[in-house]
């Protein structure tokens, strides 16, 4: 299923991890993303309750999930978990999900936080911002989600 988004669509992005999920928010009109929060990944119930609250608050039109891969592009153990998380987001919240190769997003996030003197404990949310910004930067003028 493909859904065209309005030019001012709001997006939520996720950097999925076993212990924490970084979340960022962005907008198609401004093509900018910002780190939002870190959701503790305690268990499935807590994870989706917290994400549901974010979706209710920000009312995104679509979601973006970082896809972890080895440097050579091969999948690894977290790849399947992130895919499952994104598919569950789509199933639970009926929002289109797009995937972004997240290789080096955490490295870029740490470097950006250090350069700005920000707290290192925000790295997961900053990684989600990097993922979403990469997604926004790669969009043509008119984008359709799958």
From Swiss-Prot:
The terms describing its cellular component in GO are: cytosol
Which GO BP terms apply?
A: rRNA 5'-end processing
Q: Which pairs of Cys residues are joined through disulfide bonds in the record? A: none
Task: Write out the annotated subcellular location.
Answer: Cytoplasm
User: Which controlled-vocabulary keywords does the entry list?
Assistant: Cytoplasm, Hydrolase, Nuclease, Ribosome biogenesis
Name the family the entry cites. Belongs to the YqgF nuclease family.
- Report the protein name in the record: Putative pre-16S rRNA nuclease
The record lists the organism as: Burkholderia thailandensis (strain ATCC 700388 / DSM 13276 / CCUG 48851 / CIP 106301 / E264)
């Amino acid at each position: 299923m493909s859904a065209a988004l309005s030019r001012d669509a709001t997006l939520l992005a996720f950097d999925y991890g076993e212990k924490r999920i970084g979340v960022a928010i962005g907008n198609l009109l401004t093509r900018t993303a910002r780190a939002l929060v870190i959701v503790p990944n305690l268990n499935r119930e807590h994870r989706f309750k917290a994400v549901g609250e974010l979706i209710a608050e920000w009312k995104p039109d679509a979601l973006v999930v970082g896809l972890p891969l080895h440097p050579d592009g091969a999948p690894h153990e977290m790849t399947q978990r992130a895919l499952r998380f994104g598919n569950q987001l789509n199933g639970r919240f009926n929002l289109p999900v797009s995937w972004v190769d997240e290789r080096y997003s955490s490295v870029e996030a740490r470097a950006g936080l250090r350069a700005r003197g920000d707290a290192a404990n925000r790295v997961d949310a900053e990684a989600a911002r990097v993922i979403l910004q990469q997604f926004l930067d790669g969009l043509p003028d008119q984008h359709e989600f799958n």
